[in-house]
UniProtKB/Swiss-Prot annotation:
Mg(2+) binds at D470, N497, G499. This is Pyruvate decarboxylase 1. It comes from Pisum sativum (Garden pea). Substrate binds at D55, H142, E503. InterPro entries: DHS-like_NAD/FAD-binding_dom, PDC/IPDC-like, THDP-binding, Thiamin_PyroP_enz_cen_dom, Thiamin_PyroP_enz_TPP-bd_dom, TPP_enzyme_TPP-bd, TPP_PDC_IPDC, TPP_PYR_PDC_IPDC-like.
Length: 593
């Protein structure tokens, strides 16, 4: 249940990269819905709002600009604005974007659907029609030409957890606050449509600053918690070589600390599912790598699948994470811990038992068992180094990632684009405090450009290292412009191998071949001498070494775009295996009727 208190949430403003060119007008905004929304965003920790202007949202944008603690980041298109809010939310805990009605709202849908799939609270605000136009049988621009213009709302109903259509100032305060608090409680996107004639009108409900939210923590059913802990402890304590595997829902459950408490107490080997990478410290002595079935990191898959009990914490088992439904795990050996439910083998399944409560309590009951860790250490062989290259040999992708491994630190974050970068980045061993993000569940190519923009805008203390394929880059390339305008200093490795490599390995065809671009020329044209941007073409290891030295030295304060030329067939062995298995799953014939 939501209550309100005067206690501030403790958030601090992030420095803004580019001050607004429009003068502040706070005196004209007192007691208005526009000011309330701006203050509410600041109060929940948002310091940057990603936007694309349109005639229905311009007055609202004036009020957001007038808030001194908010920075409006104008994006090149709505899709990237949504992806940027997604990336910002990953680093900051919540993101926000503003677009215009229907033409903007339908353009941002794909990004909001991705945020929904990844359990990210994104506040999607749309400047809507004049409140007087609803129900008048009029036809408006930016609609599909019908007097009923509810199509945008209908689309958002399936990919947001709450929808607020604000057409009346009397209930605007309640609708806005309910939407934002619901996003935070459910960790899902919400949709807020605001009539274009309403943001600047004073109303008594907005006469004072918003009272900060207090989101009461959810408390487990005590009887269910005790039963789940007792049953789980008995299940695990009789096992000979149990393991623990962290999944992506650790984030939404806010249970990373409890996960490590249990891992420390149990002594089990610690693995992560691919979409859980970055949520578990990889410098822990019991960390054994990524469990991804047939494409797991070396020896991790063998240890997990040979265990007689495995604790999956916050997993998502889909066709991608299960490598075409080919995981060699058995339900009767599994303890599945979801954010609000615990399921033990083929037996007990208890709801309203929350992940952090359960793991903390189980840590006190479980016996330490390091058998599987010792087995791992006996069979583990350190990964080899890439084969010695010939002089002036074209750069191999495994050599590129050897250098990226040396580049990352606790002061960096890795953004991995959908494609072969998924597999190469999974093999990176993340130093302590190194961020890591990718979009495993939704898998929308091009996501990483906007996500890099948003993450870098939120995490100003880290330098983002983005790994993007050429096909994905062509989908969303324009917002390199916004990165330069905001003074960001990310390092982008553009892997130019002439096509959609991940699609080639699933099902090849002429549709996977793309027009090659002069990518550094493209970025230089966008740069146009304004802001700090540096580009390089890399064809050999010598080129790469020199480029990284420049990016971390003379150009350390610039956006660095490094185009890496790779052979079209130079893919990770994991992608080859994964692609064949996913292809087999996709091509299953219909079941007999």
């Amino acid at each position: 249940m939501e209550t309100e208190t005067e206690t501030p949430n403790g958030s601090t403003p992030c420095p803004t990269s580019a001050p607004s060119a429009i003068p502040l007008r706070p005196s004209s905004c007192d007691g208005t819905m526009g000011r309330h929304l701006a203050r509410r965003l600041v109060e929940i920790g948002v310091r940057d709002v990603f936007s694309v202007p349109g005639d229905f949202n311009l007055t609202l944008l004036d009020h957001l600009i007038a808030e001194p603690e908010l920075n409006l980041v104008g994006c090149c298109n709505e899709l990237n604005a949504g992806y940027a809010a997604d990336g910002y939310g990953r680093a900051k805990g919540v993101g926000a974007c503003v677009v215009t009605f229907t033409v903007g709202g339908l353009s941002i849908l794909n990004a909001i659907a991705g945020a929904y799939s990844e359990n990210l609270p994104v506040i999607c605000i749309v400047g809507g029609p004049n409140s007087n136009d609803y129900g008048t049988n009029r036809i408006l621009h930016h609609t599909i030409g019908l007097p009923d213009f509810s199509q945008e709302l209908q689309c958002f109903q399936t990919i947001t957890c709450f929808q607020a259509v604000v057409n009346n100032l009397d209930d605007a305060h309640e609708l806005i606050d309910t939407a934002i608090s619901t996003a935070l409680k459910e960790s899902k996107p919400v949709y807020i449509s605001i009539g274009c004639n309403l943001p600047a009108i004073p109303h008594p409900t907005f006469a004072r600053d918003p009272v900060p939210f207090f989101l009461a923590p959810r408390v487990s059913n005590q009887a269910g918690l005790e039963a789940a802990v007792e049953e789980a402890a008995a299940f695990l304590n009789k096992a000979v070589k149990p393991v623990i595997v962290g999944g992506p829902k650790l984030r939404v459950a806010k249970a990373q600390k409890a996960f490590m408490e249990f891992a420390e107490a149990s002594g089990y080997p610690i693995a992560v599912m691919p979409s859980g990478k970055g949520l578990v410290p990889e410098n822990h002595p019991h960390f054994i790598g990524t469990y991804w079935g047939a494409v797991s990191t070396s020896y991790c898959g063998e240890i997990v699948e040979s265990a007689d009990a495995y604790v999956f914490v916050g997993p998502i088992f889909n066709d991608y994470s299960s490598v075409g439904y080919s995981l060699l795990i058995k339900k009767e050996k599994s303890l599945i811990v979801q954010p609000n439910r615990v399921t033990i083998g083929n037996g007990l399944s208890l709801g309203w038992v929350f992940m952090a409560d359960f793991l903390t309590a189980l840590a006190k009951k479980v016996k330490t068992n390091t058998t599987a860790v010792e087995n791992y250490r006996r069979i583990y062989v350190p990964p080899g180094i890439p084969l010695k290259r010939e002089k002036d040999e074209p750069l191999r992708v495994n050599v590129l990632f050897k250098h990226i491994q040396a580049l990352i630190s606790g002061d960096t974050a890795v953004i991995a684009e959908t494609g072969d970068s998924w597999f190469n980045c999974q093999k990176l061993r993340l130093p302590e405090n190194c961020g890591y993000e990718f979009q495993m569940q939704y898998g929308s190519i091009g996501w990483s450009v906007g996500a890099t923009l948003g993450y870098a805008q939120a995490a100003t203390d880290k330098r983002v290292i983005a790994c993007i394929g050429d096909g994905s880059f062509q989908v969303t390339a324009q917002d390199i412009s916004t990165m330069i305008r905001c003074g960001q200093r990310s390092i982008i490795f553009l892997i130019n191998n002439g096509g959609y490599t991940i699609e080639v390995e699933i099902h090849d065809g002429p549709y996977n071949v793309i027009k090659n671009w002069d990518y550094t020329g493209f970025v230089s044209a966008i740069h146009n001498g304004q802001g700090k941007c540096w580009t390089a073409k890399v064809r050999t290891e010598e080129d790469l070494t020199e480029a990284i030295a420049t990016a971390t030295g003379a150009e350390k304060d610039s956006l660095c775009f490094i185009e890496v030329f790779a052979h079209k067939d130079d893919t990770s062995k994991e992608l080859l295996e994964w692609g064949s298995r996913v292809a087999a799953a996709n091509s299953r014939p219909p079941n007999p009727q």
